[in-house]
Amino acid sequence: WTDAALYSLQFIGPPNTFGLTLVNEGVSLIGPNAAINSPTGVYWMDKKGFYTYNGSVVPLPCSVHSFVFDDLNSEQAFQVFGFLNKQFNEVGWFYCAAGSLTVSKYVVFNYVEQTWAIGELSRTAWLDEGIVAFPRAAGYADGNNYIYSHETGHDDDGVPMDNVFIESADFDIGDGEEFQFIRRFIPDVKFTGDSGSTQTLNVVLKARDFPGQSLTTDQTTAFTASTTKIDTRARARQAAVRFESDDDADTGARLGVGFVIGATRLDLQPNGRR
């Protein structure tokens, strides 16, 4: 990479003869460690977007583009680094948010499902599984440096993981033309933690009538392994669903909780345009 183009370096012949070929102009690399190789090609973060190369350069459509690049400390772009999480078909990048001098956020792309996710986490280096059984990452917290083992365990330090959540982007209910009455919804949740049938999380339904409005919380419901459905009486054009840790529960009940989210189904009924 240069500041304005991508080149390919190929071996031509002995003893040490290589050829430099222009691959694509108008692309760059935001930082020296912002490229990552994956089973489906090379991915990298540019100063204004994301790209992949598998014989040709292809821009990646990104549904969270504004979230990342409108909140990026460009003066700390050299700290951006890419990572591979092969177990979950993901590549991603850690970066410094606006106003932060250290890495504080990440963006992830699933190259099989073609979906994006965002989050907040402080990591400074990443080694995917292979040499070790699980991914390892370096991080800094409370004045100390740590090596974290990822994708294993839930709260190995004996402290519950509070403020944990997965939240969807807001989506149109139906086509968004008419109001829809949400009678109930059926979350697809699999609890994977160590505390068995006592595991609980909160399911939050948010809604709004018009795109320019803020999402408001319509309902928060506790969800366990025995919960089959959640009845509601929400009316809106757009909605979002959030799954979060039950931080109000006793400490013992919050330990060993883990969950995986599938596709949530909504029971809808048209409810007019006004």
Each model region followed by its residue ranges:
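Surface-exposed extracellular loop regions of Gram-negative outer-membrane beta-barrel proteins
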Residues: 1-24
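Beta-sheet repeat architectures centered on beta-propellers
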Residues: 26-41, 47-274
